[in-house]
């Protein structure tokens, strides 16, 4: 069972002489049957939760007066103000004292009041008086009621944070034995999901009470926004979701007046309420309404984040959807779905997961498991899901989904943007790509295309030219008038975040992090020590592969989003992390890459005429330096290829690459090797450097020794040589491309950041947080040299961590681990497909003559149509109707009109008053018991 938080020790948990009146009062209010039967103990949350109110917030005299009054009042029975005075034995002498205690109890959440609930479906009744004498008071339930009201009182919570624990316990203990017996509609317990209104606008059978606009119109003029009790309470328990806790709860009718008058909220207009609802939908929050007063009254609309919501927990923890679910269920049109995963990412319950659209080899469809329901099953703790917030974030079924999305480190919705491109919706395709990658134009030129390596179409003939299509889509981003600037979606009702975040390093990881922080509403600052941002994109990749205007165009979009980039600033030298903290920076993302080059450890390795590939390429990228004579490049990877090709294109007469590995085992890609040879680079394999020959400390040649093996019996890089077999090459310039190193200088001086192998930082594998809690790391500085797309993916994840950290959210609860499974390509049946062969963009022969111009063409629109038609459409979203609660958030995320809500369970819109709950629970429980018996009998017969 979920244990109570141990964040705080309730002050009154072990009272030796508890107030008997308080014991009696909380025993009356509680709906925990266990507590009612055995009596209230001081260790019960009912007692210590209210003891901090009656013992610490009130004087002894006030407490006695308050409890005497409250004990005379029946639970949830409304008493006119004059009747309350009479119950309190008010007279001319103590009238002010009684009024004061009534007001105090209202502010503290022990009393609730309204002005007669004078509303109709057409709106508020006219001429309703709203003075003190017009109020009706009552003792509220714990939930929904006083537990929320205490948690909505920020000052009270700050004095008594154990009230957050009280709220959490009172949404668990009374329900753990009941939820399985609750019928559709919730039986007047707690809260009820109400769908996104647009999602049900085409349904003919909807009821007024299923529409948010109906309730807002009913109470128009009496609407208010308040602190979200769940968000604030969970934040107090260090389990926050990182949302701003202000104004997500909309009080309606007299509740809005109650909250405004007791300091819990403020008035808002109908339009302001609708704006909050839209903002909630943008963030993926679930709309819920109170469900304890029947179908003619609600008192709040909540916009709930499943990571912290105590109401949604009642259905998700216990796996009992009747506690929350609306009358609707999601349905996917497989013919339209492209497995982009947007609906999956936002589904609060995990009802949506990515699966397989293609048939299995035997022609059958993959069968997906369904969540068992308590309707005809025995229920207990073995059926609960205590990790529901994490399991809801599992992206796909174990049988797998589209290989392209799985293989991509950033898990871009490849199938989705190919479909949009096929429809000519290029801007929408670009938007979809940028959900996961802010550098589509860059990656369209330099990505190593793991998506294509795994493309299912490759099993038939050739993979789809995914990267070429992406490049075409991204071309519009290069023109200022057509650039797509993403919408800023902030989990706050107060505008963009004020917290300052520093990103140290302006390479792909740092800039990706900045992009996604900006998209969440921050104004991050990037500190880059070089004159231009981009890191290895700018200084490491030759311009014939990636021209700098492409990088600059995509960086310009980040600036438009609010990213500030400060170049020429070296943190640790020009300013320290400590100084940045003093300037208000709350967190740091260190993504400085591996900007140093490794040396081979041989004689004369630093002689004049030697360079690391990193430094050589940086110089070349900042002004094409002319070369001549003989150049030797030591190394067999893609960086070595780049250095060799740049040297050749810069005028070197002879360029020779020396690789330890055989040609078949070279780290460089086959495509890169062939292009290098086409440029005139000579490659010799199976040799390593022994010594640099010099004359007057200037390199003149390289002595090589035969490499016998590269990998040892433990599968580790551990080359061995035949020192007797030597070879000598003439060299005017020797370039080492044998690895990269981290150059820290004084960047982390004085911090607690720990280091592992070599001088790489140690960080949590999920959050990237270091031992210095406000410092996070990522990109090549953490992983070692990898591809741009790997750094981009890490930067995206780092943005999530930084957001959670600066907003005091929990670092891992409800976090998408971004884990995907590839479908079994050996167990599929592809019966029909477009027979077109793979399309290549080709090369511009004129540009090819210019050594540092990108001569690769972009696909034409017609070629894009042909190429996108080759996609087999492997993946699809699968709905588990048993887990779906009909919130409709999925429909707001789908760009393909592939998911919709259907009114499958109209009985779930039955709203009843809390006092009648057992009139509905008991008959349902009896039917359920009968079903379970018959199910067992049928099972026994089999």
Question: Where does each model-flagged region fall?
Answer:
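Short, amphipathic alpha-helical interaction segments positioned at domain boundaries
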Residues: 122-173
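A conserved FAD-binding loop/helix module that cradles the flavin
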Residues: 781-806
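Glycine-rich dinucleotide-binding loop and its adjacent helix/turn
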Residues: 473-494, 553-573, 597-650, 755-771
């Amino acid at each position: 069972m979920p244990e109570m938080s141990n964040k705080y020790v309730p002050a009154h948990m072990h009272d030796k002489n508890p107030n008997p009146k308080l014991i009696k009062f909380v025993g009356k209010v509680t709906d925990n049957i266990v507590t009612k039967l055995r009596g209230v103990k001081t260790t019960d949350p009912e007692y210590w939760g209210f003891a901090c109110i009656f013992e610490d917030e009130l004087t002894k005299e006030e407490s006695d007066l308050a409890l005497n009054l409250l004990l005379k009042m029946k639970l949830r029975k409304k008493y006119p103000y004059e009747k309350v005075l009479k119950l309190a034995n008010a007279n001319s002498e103590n009238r002010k004292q009684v009024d004061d205690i009534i007001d105090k109890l209202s502010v503290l959440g022990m009393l609730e009041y309204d002005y007669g609930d004078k509303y109709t479906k057409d709106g508020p009744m006219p001429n309703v008086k709203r003075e003190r004498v017009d109020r009706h008071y009552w003792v509220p339930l714990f939930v929904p009621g006083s537990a929320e009201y205490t948690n909505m009182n920020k000052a009270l919570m700050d004095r008594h944070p154990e009230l957050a624990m009280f709220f959490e316990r009172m949404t668990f203990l009374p329900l753990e034995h009941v939820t399985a017996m609750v019928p559709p509609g919730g039986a007047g317990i707690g809260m009820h999901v109400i769908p996104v209104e647009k999602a049900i606008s085409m349904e003919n059978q909807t009821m007024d009470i299923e529409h948010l606009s109906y309730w807002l119109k009913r109470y128009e003029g009496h609407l208010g926004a308040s602190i979200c009790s769940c968000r604030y309470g969970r934040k107090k328990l260090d389990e926050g979701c990182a949302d701003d806790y202000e104004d997500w709860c909309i009080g309606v009718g007299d509740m809005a007046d109650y909250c405004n008058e007791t300091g819990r909220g403020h008035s808002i207009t109908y339009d302001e309420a609708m704006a909050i609802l839209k903002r909630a939908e943008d963030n993926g929050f679930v709309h819920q309404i109170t469900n304890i007063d029947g179908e003619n009254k609600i008192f709040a609309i909540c916009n709930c984040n499943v990571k912290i919501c105590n109401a949604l927990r009642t259905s998700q923890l216990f796996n009992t959807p009747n506690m929350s679910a609306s009358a609707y269920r999601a349905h996917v049109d497989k013919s339209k779905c492209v497995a982009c995963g947007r609906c999956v990412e936002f589904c609060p319950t995990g009802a949506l997961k990515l699966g397989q659209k293609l048939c299995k080899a035997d022609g059958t469809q993959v069968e997906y498991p369904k969540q068992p329901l308590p309707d005809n099953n025995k229920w207990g703790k073995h059926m609960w899901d205590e990790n529901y917030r994490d399991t809801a974030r599992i992206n796909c079924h174990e049988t797998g989904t589209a290989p392209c999305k799985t293989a991509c480190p950033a898990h871009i919705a490849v199938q989705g943007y190919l479909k949009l491109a096929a429809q000519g919706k290029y801007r929408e395709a670009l938007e979809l790509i940028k959900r996961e990658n802010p550098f589509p134009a860059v990656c369209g030129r330099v990505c190593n295309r793991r998506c294509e390596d795994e493309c299912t179409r490759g099993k038939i003939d050739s993979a789809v030219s995914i990267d070429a299509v992406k490049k075409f889509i991204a071309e519009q981003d290069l023109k200022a008038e057509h650039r797509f600037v993403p919408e800023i979606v902030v989990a706050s009702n107060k505008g963009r975040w004020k917290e300052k975040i520093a990103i140290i390093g302006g390479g792909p990881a740092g800039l990706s992090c900045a992009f996604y922080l900006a998209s969440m509403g921050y104004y991050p600052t990037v500190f880059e020590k070089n004159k231009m941002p981009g890191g290895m994109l700018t200084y490491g990749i030759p311009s014939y592969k990636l021209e700098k205007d492409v990088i600059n165009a995509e960086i310009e979009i980040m600036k438009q989003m609010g990213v500030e980039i400060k170049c020429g600033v070296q943190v640790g030298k020009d300013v320290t992390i400590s100084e940045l903290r003093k300037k208000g920076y709350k967190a740091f993302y260190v993504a400085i890459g591996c900007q140093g080059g490794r040396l081979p450890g041989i004689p004369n390795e630093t002689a004049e005429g030697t360079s690391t590939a990193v430094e050589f390429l940086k110089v070349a990228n900042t002004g094409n330096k002319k070369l001549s004579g003989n150049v030797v490049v030591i190394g067999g990877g893609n960086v070595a290829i780049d250095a060799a090709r740049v040297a050749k294109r810069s005028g070197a007469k002879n360029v020779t690459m020396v690789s330890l590995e055989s040609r078949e085992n070279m780290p460089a890609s086959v495509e890169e090797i062939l292009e290098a040879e086409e440029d005139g680079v000579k490659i010799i394999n199976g040799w390593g450097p022994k010594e640099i020959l010099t004359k007057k400390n200037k390199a003149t040649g390289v002595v090589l020794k035969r490499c016998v093996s590269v990998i040892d019996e433990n599968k580790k890089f551990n080359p061995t040589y035949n020192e007797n077999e030597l070879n000598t090459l003439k060299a005017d310039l020797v370039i080492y491309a044998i690895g990269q190193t981290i150059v820290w200088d004084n960047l982390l001086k004085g911090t607690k950041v720990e280091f592992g192998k070599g001088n790489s930082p140690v960080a949590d594998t999920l959050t990237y947080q270091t031992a210095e809690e406000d410092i996070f790391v990522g990109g090549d500085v953490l992983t070692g040299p990898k591809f741009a797309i790997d750094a981009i993916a890490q930067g995206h994840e780092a943005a999530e961590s930084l957001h959670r950290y600066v907003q005091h959210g929990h670092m891992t609860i409800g976090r998408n681990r971004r884990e995907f499974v590839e479908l079994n390509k050996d167990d599929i049946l592809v019966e029909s497909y477009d027979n077109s062969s793979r399309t290549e963009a080709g090369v511009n022969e004129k540009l090819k003559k210019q050594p540092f111009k990108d001569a690769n063409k972009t696909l034409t629109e017609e070629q894009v149509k042909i190429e996108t038609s080759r996609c087999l459409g492997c993946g699809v979203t699968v709905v588990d109707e048993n887990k779906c609660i009909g919130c409709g958030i999925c429909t707001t995320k789908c760009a393909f009109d592939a998911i919709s809500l259907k009114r499958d369970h109209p009985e779930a819109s039955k709203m009843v008053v809390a006092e009648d709950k057992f009139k509905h629970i008991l008959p349902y429980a009896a039917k359920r018991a009968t079903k379970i018996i018959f199910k067992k009998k049928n099972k026994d017969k089999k």
